[in-house]
From Swiss-Prot:
<comment type="similarity">
    <text>Belongs to the TFIIF alpha subunit family.</text>
</comment>
<dbReference type="Pfam" id="PF05793">
    <property type="entry name" value="TFIIF_alpha"/>
</dbReference>
<dbReference type="InterPro" id="IPR008851">
    <property type="entry name" value="TFIIF-alpha"/>
</dbReference>
<feature type="modified residue" description="Phosphoserine">
    <location>
        <position position="217"/>
    </location>
</feature>
<dbReference type="GO" id="GO:0032091">
    <property type="term" value="P:negative regulation of protein binding"/>
</dbReference>
<feature type="modified residue" description="Phosphothreonine">
    <location>
        <position position="156"/>
    </location>
</feature>
<comment type="subunit">
    <text>Heterodimer of an alpha and a beta subunit. Interacts with GTF2F2, CTDP1, TAF6/TAFII80 and URI1. Interacts with GTF2B (via C-terminus and preferentially via acetylated form); this interaction prevents binding of GTF2B to GTF2F2.</text>
</comment>
<dbReference type="GO" id="GO:0019211">
    <property type="term" value="F:phosphatase activator activity"/>
</dbReference>
<keyword id="KW-0539">Nucleus</keyword>
<protein>
    <recommendedName>
        <fullName>General transcription factor IIF subunit 1</fullName>
    </recommendedName>
</protein>
<dbReference type="GO" id="GO:0019903">
    <property type="term" value="F:protein phosphatase binding"/>
</dbReference>
<keyword id="KW-0238">DNA-binding</keyword>
<dbReference type="GO" id="GO:0032968">
    <property type="term" value="P:positive regulation of transcription elongation by RNA polymerase II"/>
</dbReference>
<dbReference type="InterPro" id="IPR036388">
    <property type="entry name" value="WH-like_DNA-bd_sf"/>
</dbReference>
<feature type="compositionally biased region" description="Polar residues">
    <location>
        <begin position="428"/>
        <end position="443"/>
    </location>
</feature>
<feature type="compositionally biased region" description="Low complexity">
    <location>
        <begin position="389"/>
        <end position="406"/>
    </location>
</feature>
<dbReference type="InterPro" id="IPR011039">
    <property type="entry name" value="TFIIF_interaction"/>
</dbReference>
Amino acid sequence: MAALGSSSQNVTEYVVRVPKNTAKRYNIMAFNAADKVNFATWNQARLERDLSNKKIYQEEEMPESGAGSEFNRKLREEARRKKYGIVLKEFRPEDQPWLLRVNGKSGRKFKGIKKGGVTENTAYYIFTQCADGAFEAFPVQNWYNFTPLARHRTLTAEEAEEEWERRNKVLNHFSIMQQRRLKDQDQDEDEEEKEKRSRKKPSELRIHDLEDDLEMSSDASDASGEEGSRASKAKKKAPVTKAGRKKKKKKGSDDEAFEDSDDGDFEGQEVDYMSDGSSSSPDEAEGKPKVPQQEDGPKGVDEQSESSEESEEEKPPEEDKEEEEEKKAPTPQEKKRRKDSSDDSDSSEESDIDSETSSALFMAKKKTPPKRERKPSGGSSKGTSRPGTPSAEAASTSSTLRAAASKLEQGKRTSETPAAKRLRMDTGPQSLSGKSTPSSGDVQVTEDAVRRYLTRKPMTTKDLLKKFQTKKTGLSSEQTVNVLAQILKRLNPERKMIGDKMHFSLKE
C-alpha cells in the first residue's frame, strides 16, 4: 500500500482542452523514411493544389438557348444517367493532391495524395501546449502521403510506344542471332552424323516408307517394269500359251491344205476358231457388237493387260506365216493391199494400226471361209448352233479375196477398222458389267478411278493404296503398287509437300 501511495504522488496531471468551434482545419503530412526528409534544411517551401484534373470533371459547355442549343438537354441527360445508373462525381478541390516545392526551382518536389478511410473508424488529434501548461486538442481532418516527384523528363505515350517497338526489335535481333547459332550447330551435328554413317558398313538394315517404295517403283518402271510384269505373267500363263501354240500348229496344218480344201472340210474345226479370243472375226470388223459367252468369267485389270500382252506376243508368228503364204501365192489384190498399207504407214501412226488390223482381218478371212457362212444363219454369238447351207460368197477363196480387195480400194476398211477396235475396247467393260459382273464391293484400279480421287482432294500414295485394297481389287499388293505407279506416270499429277508428305492432285 505504501508503494501505491508513493507512486500516486509521482503522477503529474495535464489539462486538455478540446475547442468546440475551430476555424482552423488540421491535416497530417506523411513522408517516407527512405526519402530522408530533413525540415531543418528547408529554407523555402511552397504548397499548392494540383487542379489539373479539373478538365476531366468539367462538362461540355453548351448554350441553353439560341443557336446550337437543345431542348431540355439537361433533363434528358439526367434521365439517361438514371437509366444507366451513372453517378457523376463532383470536382472537389479539397480532394485534389498537394504539390510541395522545397527550396525553389532547383529543390525537390513532392506530391501528396489523400489517403481515404483514415478518419472513418478512428480519430486523430493534434495536441498543442499553451502558455499556461494546458494542451489544446484539434481533430485531424485528412491524411496525405507525400512522395518525391522524379526530376527527369518522362516519356509521352507516343515516345513510350516507339521505345517499346525498338526494344522488341532488339530482342528479336538477339533471338534471331541465337536461332542462327543453333541452326549452325545442328548442321554441324548433321554433317558429323552423315560422316559416321558413311564410315559404317553398307550392309545395315534399312526401313523404307511405303511412299518411298512407290516412288522408287514408279521411277524404275520405265526400264524394268514392263519386262518384270511380262516375266511374271508368262510364268502364270504358261499353260495358256502352250494351248495357244497348239492352236497355231493346228492352224498351220490347216493352212498347208488350204488350196485343196473343199467347202465342208472346215466344219469340224469351226469351234476352235470361234473360241479363239486373239483373232478378230469379220463380225467385229463390220461393227457388230460381240455377245459374251456365259462360260467367260469376270476379267480383272491384270487379266486384260495379260490378254493384250499375249495378243502382242502372238502377232509376230502370225505375220511370219502371212509373209510365207504371200511369198508362195502372191496375187495382184495382195500387191495392191501392200502398197496401200505402206502408204498409210508413211503418213501417220494411226494408219499403221489400221493397216495392221486390216491385214489381220484379211488373213483371217482367207484362213476361215466358213465364218462367212455363219452370218446368214444369224450366229453372231459364239453359240453352239451349226451353220446352215454355205452362202454363195463362200464358194471359193477367190471370191473372198476379191470382196476384201474391193473394200480396201473403196476405203471402207480404213474407216471400219478403228471402229471395230473401239468396239473391242468398249465391249470389254460391257462384258464385265453384263452377265459376268463382279460383286458390288469389287473395285478396279483404273485410270478414271485414280483421276476421280485426285480431283477431289490431294492424296498421298498411302491414301490411294487404302482406296484400292487387295480384298476389293483381287490383286496382290505388288501388282497394285505397280499399276498405281504406271497410272500416276500417265496422269502426271501435281505434287505438293503438305506436312512433310508428298501429295498428288489433279485439276478438273
